[in-house]
Amino acid sequence: MAAATERTDELVREYLLFRGFTAALKQLDAEIKADREKGFRVDKIVEQLQQFVQSYDLAALRDYWGYLDRRLFSRLEDMYRPTVNKLKTSLYRYYLVHTVQTGRNDKAQEFFLKQASELQNQAEWKDWFVLPFLPAPDSNPTFATYFSRQWADTFIVSLHNFLSVLFQCMPVPVILNLEAECHRSSLIQEENESLRHKLFALQAESSRMKKEELEVEEAVVHHKLPAYVANMDRLGDSELDMTCSQRSTAHSLQSRGGFLSSLLSQSKKGPARPAQPSGASPTQTGSVLLGKKEPANHQSAKGKEGTASSKDGKSHFSGLVAGESSSLQQRQKRLQEHGKERRELLSKGTSQVQSAEKKADISTSEPEPCSEPQADQAETSTKMPASSTESVGVRQEQPFIVLSQEEYGEHHSSIMYCRVDCSGRRVASLDVDGVIKVWSFNPIMQTKASSISKSPLLSLEWATKRDRLLLLGSGVGTVRLYDTEAKKNLCEISIDEDMPRILSLACSPSGASFVCSAAAQSPISHMDFSVVTSGGKSMNQVPGKLLLWDTKTMKQQLQFSLEPEPIAINCTAFNHNGNLLVTGAADGIVRLFDMQQHECAMSWKAHDGEVYSVEFSYDENTVYSIGEDGKFIQWNIHKSGLKISEYALPSEATGPFVLSGYSGYKQVQFPRGRLFAFDSEGNYMLTCSSTGGVIFKLNGEDKVLESCLSLGGHRAPVVTVDWSTAMDCGTCLTASMDGKIKLTTLLAQKS
């Protein structure tokens, strides 16, 4: 409701300004500024009550609660009146406990003097009048419960939940329902689009079935990743070649039918062996599907006429018998696969027949999550191994209360980016299939805009001033400006034909410009995966450029100098005022740029391998970086290369991220989005893990990394995170390889 109210206020302002009602507009702004209901923001109302308690302002506390009672609680049915009275009693006791804990017994006595006439006839208050005169009330059995931290936290959460439910259930004017109506219309449009895609998919399947009925060859099956996904790989155009070899006494033929791959997923399918080892490096993005060898002893396919069995017992695939009976059996199995393939086609959101055929080739062996379901309730994490120079501890007292955890599940493939806008109201998410979703989560999750890119997308960034705009970097050398409210592209600019991969985008806090990292295609298209998984460093450091563009004119302002040689920049981040820019590159070097002089102020070798993610600290005197070597390091920006602290993180926090399935395949994704994020004061850090986000406490004095809270909730590895503190309650985003995004709302426990 708060989001709808805020949006309606903006619409009313726009209307009054359009009509020239300036006096009414000024009056509206004045009343909104003095709004005691805080725009139906529950967190703001609770914060206001806490401020009155902490300032010992009893009169203001009584007056504000009375206003809420008249304005909101009076609308409730009589059956809820006891609940309101209990909350009021708890609020007064919360005030009294605070006065005693802070040594202000005079305020406690003042409370009973002013409230005596109201409270003396209430049975629940008869024991409380002696409170100011007890020497140690926190040890008294009557009052000990109320002096515990648990009771105070429970009261705040109960009050927060009560107000939230009240705002969701109260009747609202018609104008506030406009957003819901728009959302309903959007859902209908999406449903129509989905049905249209389904029609195209069925037509494609029908055409393919007619062609395959004419083919009787059997086969070596050649699998390739679609170029759409392959171009996103950081090392280059990774492709997956699967060779099916058949040793039969009769013959060995090749099949041109792409749909034969669906037959191999049945009981007659043997293990796949890659023709060429393939791998990837974080200079290119995407998920790489790799074949995993299985035991090679399989029986040959059965047919009514019988087939010749494999002589050596070691062939990877057994033969399929050609003949009428075998063809009939194949067609029956194809029909069993049609439902699954159509769902896969619809989830990818394409209406092209060629694209549908490509996606069907890889949909038959979709990896399944190997981990058990994680409990939704947050729990304390175990101790994390540290490097030889730093230690990692376990924090016993949790600094946050988990208010809720929700799931956004409209993506159907691995997430690359997931970012909250500056206002903390909307989220933009991008998956490896080029599907962009813009959605809100307050008060309920709603998809505001959805788009499917024809060209592969590699990067995403919110504009800072006009937070309705998104910057989208592609794999074909272009950057698009997308309006999330109008749901259309405002413009598209070409960066560099020789540097087609836009690896990173960062918008200046002033909103006047943005930096763009462009990189060339990798000259190496295949790499041995064993090198990558064993921790080997990237051998493919491609050249790149770092460019500054004007946001208004969408013209290039300058190109930064990258020393010692031009290199692909993987990650970029501005400080709070945009005067400094920190970057992490494929050569392992962190560079700090002076944006006023437009030159590199300092650079240093930070990691053995590529730099995956960089961020400024809260005080901006240091920067943090995560690299291919699995280290999380803090650097002093006032002295080049001065290391303040270093921690060794597990591979599940730094990547590459691996999702294994029972089908024998592995899906591997290299880091692309943000790998860590800080809270509002920079004391806590959110990172990735195999089952959800993990929060650590950063302790600069003791140089330890304390594991505080495990958010959990994921069945697949988390590949990118974000932490929004624009609202009073922190919002943690964790996105995983199965396309699920968890949104966890945290309430900080003030010490």
Swiss-Prot record:
SUPFAM superfamilies: WD40 repeat-like. Residues 278-287, 377-391 have a biased composition (Polar residues). GO terms for cellular component: cytosol; early endosome membrane; endosome membrane; late endosome membrane. Its main location: membrane. WD repeats lie at residues 410-449, 452-492, 497-559, 564-603, 606-645, 668-706, 713-751. It comes from the Eukaryota. SMART domains: WD40. GO terms for biological process: early endosome to late endosome transport; negative regulation of phosphatidylinositol 3-kinase/protein kinase B signal transduction. GO terms for molecular function: phosphatidylinositol 3-kinase inhibitor activity; phosphatidylinositol 3-kinase regulator activity. It is found in: Early endosome membrane; Late endosome membrane. Keywords: Coiled coil, Endosome, Membrane, Repeat, WD repeat. Transmembrane segments: none annotated. It is a peripheral membrane protein. Residues 264-395 are annotated as: Disordered. Gene3D superfamilies: YVTN repeat-like/Quinoprotein amine dehydrogenase. Residues 334-346 have a biased composition (Basic and acidic residues). Residues 188-212 form a coiled coil. Belongs to the WD repeat WDR91 family. Functions as a negative regulator of the PI3 kinase/PI3K activity associated with endosomal membranes. By modifying the phosphatidylinositol 3-phosphate/PtdInsP3 content of endosomal membranes may regulate endosome fusion, recycling, sorting and early to late endosome transport. PANTHER family: WD REPEAT-CONTAINING PROTEIN 91. This is WD repeat-containing protein 91. It comes from Gallus gallus.
